[in-house]
Amino acid sequence: MTEIATTSGISSVGLLSVGAYRPTRVVTNDEICENIDSSDEWIYSRTGIKTRRFAAPEESAASMAIEASREAIAKAALTGSDIDGVIVATSTHFLQTPACAPIVAAALGCQNVPAFDISAGCSGFGHALGIAADMIRGGSAATILVIGTEKLSPTVDMTDRSNCFIFADGAASVLVGHSPIQGIGPTVWGSDGEQAAAIRQDIDWISHAENPAGPRPFLRMEGTAVFRWAAFEMGKVGQQAMDAAGVKPDEIDVFIPHQANSRINELLTKNLQLRPDAVIANDIEHTGNTSAASIPLAMAELLATGAAKPGDLALLIGYGAGLSYAAQVVRMPNS
């Protein structure tokens, strides 16, 4: 019997660089409150958000991904031709087809490479990172661009007092490739589809097209249900990720949870029993919840400000729509 040949790749994989793109328009809580009965103090006390960024009308998930990726590629001293895979995590590429990733790959000069999207809500970046690491270890690629990009502002009903102050726009990219030491631990991921309605689009696009005079689709969220699930279940996921990577809580230098709500992340930090001096990402304060882009955006900010250092051991936990989650232990990139 003829055996089918297979491939194998390098075992030590890590993050080479990170690039970020933040839209220029800053939206304050006071501006949000022009459409709802609320206040800057109320929003901040419950979410930790002071401001967020909204993309311009001409900007898209793809255009922001391209800008973030150009920065990541430049920081790694590479060119588009050095990249042999592009994975985009997004829920806001507003075309059924073509996917966002091939558009991004072409703009960056990544020719004839696998380029595809994944949609896993706010945990999308963790899913994409896990897939990229496994592709490289399996020999399917050597250097992969992993991107989280979202333009959530058009999906939000700005009169919905339950979530209109939460979501925002932005993109960030990491380059994944060979590392002298292991830089990405095993991915712990999963989903709970029984809670799918907790974060959802309320009307599908076909129903809207058949009744254009009716209400348009918006993003809806059951905030209390999501808060309880994330605050009390994601600590277990984080511990599983540390166990899988063979590290202990007191060895974690940096904690980068999905930037959904600073109160959730305070509870997660406590439940994980991290070191008192561990750096906790709080990019949400001035960025809002950017879904699949939030973890790499927070990573970029920590490195840019010097709060975290290259090589620091970091725990990443993404969680959100699905409900879904993905977590890894990684080493912070050099740039």
Swiss-Prot record:
Which CDD domains does the annotation name? KAS_III (cd00830)
Kinase keyword on record: no
Q: Which reaction does it catalyse?
A: malonyl-[ACP] + dodecanoyl-CoA + H(+) = 3-oxotetradecanoyl-[ACP] + CO2 + CoA
A GO molecular function held by the record: 3-oxoacyl-[acyl-carrier-protein] synthase activity
Cellular component terms per the entry's GO annotation: cytoplasm
Name the segments for region: ACP-binding. Answer: 259-263
The annotated pathway is:
Lipid metabolism; fatty acid biosynthesis; Lipid metabolism; mycolic acid biosynthesis
Q: Name one GO biological process term.
A: fatty acid biosynthetic process
Q: What is its EC number?
A: 2.3.1.301
What keywords are annotated for this sequence in UniProt?
Answer: Acyltransferase, Cytoplasm, Fatty acid biosynthesis, Fatty acid metabolism, Lipid biosynthesis, Lipid metabolism, Multifunctional enzyme, Transferase
Q: Which Pfam families does the annotation name?
A: ACP_syn_III, ACP_syn_III_C
Q: Does the keyword Membrane apply?
A: no
Q: Where is the active site?
A: 122, 258, 289
Per the record, the domain of life is Bacteria
Name the principal localization, coarsely classed.
Answer: cytoplasm
Subcellular location(s): the record lists: Cytoplasm
Return the PANTHER family for the record. Answer: 3-OXOACYL-[ACYL-CARRIER-PROTEIN] SYNTHASE 3, BETA-KETOACYL-[ACYL-CARRIER-PROTEIN] SYNTHASE III
- How are the domains described in the entry? The last Arg residue of the ACP-binding site is essential for the weak association between ACP/AcpP and FabH.
The entry's family comment says: Belongs to the thiolase-like superfamily. FabH family.
Role according to the record: Catalyzes the condensation reaction of fatty acid synthesis by the addition to an acyl acceptor of two carbons from malonyl-ACP. Catalyzes the first condensation reaction which initiates fatty acid synthesis and may therefore play a role in governing the total rate of fatty acid production. Possesses both acetoacetyl-ACP synthase and acetyl transacylase activities. Its substrate specificity determines the biosynthesis of branched-chain and/or straight-chain of fatty acids.
Alphabetical list of NCBIfam families matching this protein: fabH, PRK09352.1
Quaternary structure, from the entry: Homodimer.
> What's this protein's name?
Mycobacterial beta-ketoacyl-[acyl-carrier-protein] synthase III
